């Protein structure tokens, strides 16, 4: 797991530990999922870790919440606290999960009620809650201006996802079983610079202890640039592509390719300025291959509980009541 989480250019759906790879993607094609973008999985990647010294690890990346704009405030793109996000591993080749990592998210306001500012004339002020994610600059060394935070816990389920034995994943970096998710990228005034945000976000990479595993893994959940490449508008406009290469070779600039063709360019990628929310796990190979042949299959799912009752007088943490059995609403592998 590279500390900057740079992605391979080829989308990888299933990774064998011998590097046999295939590709897949989903960007909101299922009609019902458009009503719940927070549980919409856009891509799933699995590959051998390529950071120096990490050759004995596999990285699994599940991306959620498609088509995020950097200016998508004031609420930005929180994960759904009523959902169950899962990464499943099949290490016996029977298309049934043997290991599942379940993620549950929680939200909180600063001090329980959020930051309040005194509004009004002197002697007649009223404390008014601020409806913003932050009220000042944010950095690794000073997060006092953060007004909204997300945390998450992880459970490892062995066997059947719904009925198997579950154990908490331990946070080796800071202790306990809770992990923090950084704010989305709000802007350079908030974080000082692009580099300032990178430093801030990287501080949320955690070492994790896996039950029964001699080596630690790592986890990271945060907003990242969407690594997928596609011309979405032309695709859904009756596959309205012009010939891709207008030159005899990419970059030749001689116009001797397809008549009316275009030179390959990142400007044709309509996701180049879009973000997603990444759930990334880096796991020791020895602890996930089981007794199979050393090859794994993997997928991600998101589930919601069946009954939901909306609160007619909602508060921050009580907008609805959820209960009952979990139902899979999103799947990608």
Question: Model regions: which residues?
Answer:
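Gram-negative bacterial Sec-dependent N-terminal signal peptides
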Residues: 2-23
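Surface-exposed extracytoplasmic segments
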Residues: 23-333
């Amino acid at each position: 797991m590279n500390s900057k989480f740079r992605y391979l250019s080829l989308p990888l759906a299933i990774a064998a530990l011998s590097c046999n790879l295939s590709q897949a993607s989903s960007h909101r094609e299922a009609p019902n999922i458009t009503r719940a973008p927070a549980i919409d999985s856009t891509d799933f990647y699995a590959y051998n870790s390529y950071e120096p010294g990490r050759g004995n690890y596999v990285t699994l990346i599940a991306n959620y919440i498609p088509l995020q704009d950097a200016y998508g405030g004031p609420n930005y793109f929180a994960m759904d606290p009523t959902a169950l996000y899962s990464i499943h591993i099949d290490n016996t080749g029977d298309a049934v999960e043997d290991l599942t990592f379940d993620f549950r998210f929680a939200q909180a306001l600063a001090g329980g009620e959020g930051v309040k500012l005194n509004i009004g004339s002197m002697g007649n002020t009223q404390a008014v809650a601020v409806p913003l994610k932050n009220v000042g600059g944010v950095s690794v060394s000073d997060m006092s201006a953060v007004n909204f935070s997300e945390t998450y816990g992880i459970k490892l389920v062995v066997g059947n996802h719904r009925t198997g034995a579950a154990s908490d994943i331990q946070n080796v970096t800071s202790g306990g079983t809770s992990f923090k998710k950084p704010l989305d990228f709000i802007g350079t005034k908030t974080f000082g610079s692009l580099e300032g945000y990178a430093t801030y976000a990287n501080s949320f990479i955690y070492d994790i202890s896996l039950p029964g595993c001699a080596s630690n893994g790592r986890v990271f959940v945060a907003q990242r640039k969407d690594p997928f490449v596609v011309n979405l508008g032309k695709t859904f406009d009756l596959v309205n592509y012009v010939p891709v290469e207008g030159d005899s070779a990419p970059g030749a600039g001689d116009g001797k390719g397809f008549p009316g063709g275009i030179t390959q360019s990142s400007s044709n990628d309509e996701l180049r300025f879009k973000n997603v929310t990444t759930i990334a796990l880096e796991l020791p190979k020895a602890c996930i291959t089981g007794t199979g042949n050393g090859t794994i299959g993997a997928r991600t799912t998101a589930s919601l509980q069946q009954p939901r009752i909306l609160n007619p007088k909602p508060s921050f943490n009580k907008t609805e009541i959820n209960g009952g059995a979990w139902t899979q609403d999103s799947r990608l592998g």
